[in-house]
Amino acid sequence: MSNQKIQYKHSPFDEEMYDAMTIFNEGKPTSEQFSLIDARIISLVHSYDYSDTKFFASNKYLAEKSRSTPATVQKSINKLISYGLINKKVACSDGRKQRVLTYNEDGAEKFKTNPKAAKPMFEE
């Protein structure tokens, strides 16, 4: 991704999702809990969707934004997809394939409504 700064809008989503993730984490082993990196990534994906902007960010870019590693980012993306919070598709742009992440409104609303009942749709 270039050094061009992409503008995105803040939304009230952040606190609601963070609260739901906190409730989900209660009593779970650390390995099953949502992390701050998970919250940061879904927040970025939602912000771009909220701004009607496609989210093509690379793992390297997301690692910089979340102060982690590309491998940790990929694990987080897989987890968010497995819980139905975001979607991934591949799109062609400028003659090359790029991953596009989108916010799954229905899945996220279901999660926020009853985080304790959330289960992964598939293993990461």
Predicted segments with their positions:
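Short recognition helix of helix-turn-helix/winged-helix DNA-binding domains
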Residues: 1-72, 94-95
